[in-house]
């Protein structure tokens, strides 16, 4: 029987060397828009490439943490339901903390390997390694979909009787003055009353 360290060393010896980079690691800002009752993460492929992770692994994580179903369509990810940029950003950052960043040197030059049925994060920069935790409950703080004073990018789904554009975010109906159906607008939430939100152009 091999011990854990020997199994890890054997696995590492069979993997190609990965060059480290001194370039600043920047996670792309999620580019979201809504289509009907779904949320589209338009630059999902770019995010997965930046993280150097399998898109399917990232997608499974996000759908589990968001508590929804989803699928990958080309370079986009489609999620059932309405989600905000803040919700996606929080979950992507949590994924990076657990599955990408080295806890010893803080660099993203890592690889996921499986050693004796244990998923291990191995750092190519400093050589550190740690088992990846299996989390049953998300540690991401759940936010309200929108908040007063917050700025959001919305797609206008309809126009109300008073001429205001109407968008839906989660349980909220957002009114946007001067917007027309199909517009993608950036707005600031002025007031929330129950499930109604009133905004102005940001």
Swiss-Prot record:
It comes from the Archaea. Residues 145-202 form the TRAM domain. InterPro entries: IF2/IF5 (IPR045196), NA-bd_OB-fold (IPR012340), TIF2_bsu_arc (IPR004458), TRAM_dom (IPR002792), Transl_init_fac_IF2/IF5_dom (IPR002735), Transl_init_fac_IF2/IF5_N (IPR016189), Transl_init_fac_IF2/IF5_Zn-bd (IPR016190). Keywords: Initiation factor, Protein biosynthesis. GO terms for molecular function: translation initiation factor activity. Pfam families: eIF-5_eIF-2B, TRAM. Belongs to the eIF-2-beta/eIF-5 family. eIF-2 functions in the early steps of protein synthesis by forming a ternary complex with GTP and initiator tRNA. Heterotrimer composed of an alpha, a beta and a gamma chain. PANTHER family: EUKARYOTIC TRANSLATION INITIATION FACTOR, EUKARYOTIC TRANSLATION INITIATION FACTOR 2 SUBUNIT 2. This is Translation initiation factor 2 subunit beta. It comes from Methanosarcina mazei (strain ATCC BAA-159 / DSM 3647 / Goe1 / Go1 / JCM 11833 / OCM 88) (Methanosarcina frisia). The gene is eif2b.
């Amino acid at each position: 029987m091999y011990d854990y360290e020997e199994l890890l060393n054997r696995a590492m010896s069979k993997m190609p060397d990965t060059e480290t980079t001194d370039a600043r690691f920047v996670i792309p800002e999620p580019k979201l828009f809504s289509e009907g009752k779904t949320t589209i993460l338009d630059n999902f492929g770019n995010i997965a490439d930046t993280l150097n992770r399998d898109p399917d692994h990232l997608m499974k994580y996000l759908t589990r943490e968001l508590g929804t179903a989803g699928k990958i369509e080309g370079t986009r990810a489609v999620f059932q339901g309405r989600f905000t940029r803040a919700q996606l950003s929080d979950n992507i950052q949590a994924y990076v903390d657990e599955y990408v960043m080295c806890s010893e040197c803080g660099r993203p030059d890592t690889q996921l390997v499986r050693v004796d049925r244990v998923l291990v994060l191995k750092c190519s920069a400093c050589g550190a390694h740690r088992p990846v935790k299996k989390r049953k409950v998300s540690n991401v703080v759940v936010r309200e979909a929108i908040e007063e004073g917050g700025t959001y990018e919305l797609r206008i789904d309809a126009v109300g009787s008073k001429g205001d554009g109407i968008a839906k975010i989660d349980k909220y109906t957002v009114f946007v003055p001067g917007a027309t159906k199909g517009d993608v607008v950036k707005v600031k939430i002025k007031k929330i009353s129950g499930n109604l939100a009133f905004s102005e152009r940001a």
